């Protein structure tokens, strides 16, 4: 079973995907961390984030063992990843990696921006997670402060809105709800309620398939 979870930054899709994977005994891939890894490498080397050729080279030589690097979770790297992810050659370089991950038995949960529309268009379950931008900014602020990082909520909100704009309007694989995806508004749900709502969607889809 492949579960595709898409949505904008800080919508809660990552936590939801991780919990769903644990619940169903599936592997989990936060596809955003792949782009964060590329962005981090470019930032560390002092390279231009919009240098598509160099970024694609980095994308083709990623080491999955580094994906849990805490530095990838910084606000700076997240913003840089939004820029890098708009580069067509980078997305092309990472497409095979993501599809191969999803295809391994018994299945996987992938979360990102284009899982249900591009990476795994035939996923059994697709969920599109949304939340009010102000609520997303507040959550991201609390996350940053919990890590001991300074965080300006107004600046984070402005960045989230800018990222939404880039993600939704990029030429390749823009952020959008797949036609057959279930919409889950996570604005006023705590973690447990959000996960429960996602599990309910998965179970409803599975029950529907069993009846066919």
Curated annotation (Swiss-Prot):
Any GO BP: pyrimidine nucleotide metabolic process
Presence of keyword Cytoplasm: yes
One GO MF term: CMP kinase activity
GO cellular component terms, A-Z: cytoplasm
Coarse class of the protein's main subcellular location: cytoplasm
Keywords noted in UniProt: ATP-binding, Cytoplasm, Kinase, Nucleotide-binding, Transferase
Superkingdom of source: Bacteria
A Pfam match: Cytidylate_kin
Stored InterPro entries: Cytidylate_kin (IPR003136), Cytidylate_kinase_dom (IPR011994), P-loop_NTPase (IPR027417)
Keyword Kinase (UniProt): yes
Enzyme Commission (EC) number: 2.7.4.25
Family matches, as NCBIfam families: cmk
Protein name: Cytidylate kinase
Source organism (scientific name): Bradyrhizobium sp. (strain ORS 278)
Taxonomic path: Bacteria, Pseudomonadati, Pseudomonadota, Alphaproteobacteria, Hyphomicrobiales
Gene: cmk
């Amino acid at each position: 079973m492949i579960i595709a979870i898409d949505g904008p930054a800080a919508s809660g899709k990552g936590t939801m995907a991780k919990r769903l994977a644990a619940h169903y005994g599936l592997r989990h891939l936060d596809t955003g961390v792949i782009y964060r890894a590329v962005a981090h490498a470019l930032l560390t080397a002092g390279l231009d984030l919009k240098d598509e050729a160099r970024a694609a080279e980095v994308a083709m030589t990623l080491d999955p063992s580094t994906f849990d690097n805490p530095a990838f979770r910084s606000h700076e790297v997240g913003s840089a990843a939004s820029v890098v992810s708009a580069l067509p050659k980078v997305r092309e370089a990472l497409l095979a990696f993501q599809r191969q991950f999803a295809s391994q038995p018994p299945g996987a949960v992938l979360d990102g921006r284009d899982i249900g529309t591009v990476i795994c268009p035939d996923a059994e379950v697709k969920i599109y997670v949304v939340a009010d931008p102000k609520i997303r900014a507040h959550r991201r602020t609390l996350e940053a402060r919990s890590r001991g990082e300074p965080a300006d909520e107004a600046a984070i909100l402005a960045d989230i809105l800018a990222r939404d704009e880039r993600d939704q309007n990029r030429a390749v694989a823009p952020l959008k709800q797949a036609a057959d995806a279930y919409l889950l508004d996570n604005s006023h749900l705590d973690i447990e309620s959000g996960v429960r709502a996602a599990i309910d969607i998965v179970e409803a889809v599975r029950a529907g398939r069993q009846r066919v």
